[in-house]
A protein has these predicted regions:
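C-terminal structural segments of small proteins and small subunits
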Residues: 55-84
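SH3-family beta-barrel domains
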Residues: 1-19, 75, 79-84
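Generic secondary-structure boundary/loop-capping signal
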Residues: 4-7, 28, 62, 70-72
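Amphipathic, hydrophobic secondary-structure cores in small proteins
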Residues: 12, 16-64
Length: 84
């Protein structure tokens, strides 16, 4: 089993599966509404020139998150396609 890492630590091109979201209820609800839920396959697609925000592909959509918010999402690297 792979170790869990923060979503914000992924390199461009890395695909992973969301394990958990460790943030306050308001932000958790917002992330869930955007499709960031446990078991979702997600891919890091681009860093902005300054490194923040970071763009991720999940469920056929590209969404940018602030590095701070992405750090609250724990993922398991490997497998799957971000567009599944």
């Amino acid at each position: 089993m792979n170790d869990l890492v923060p979503l914000s630590s992924l390199k461009v091109g890395t695909t992973c599966k969301i394990d958990s979201i460790l943030t306050d209820e308001h932000m958790r609800r917002r992330l869930l509404d955007l499709g960031f839920s446990s078991g979702t396959i997600i891919k890091c697609v681009q860093y902005s020139p300054s490194g923040d925000p970071i763009a991720y592909m999940l469920r056929g959509t590209i969404i940018a998150l602030r590095k701070e918010d992405a750090g609250d999402i724990l993922v398991q690297e490997g497998g799957g396609h971000a567009w599944d």
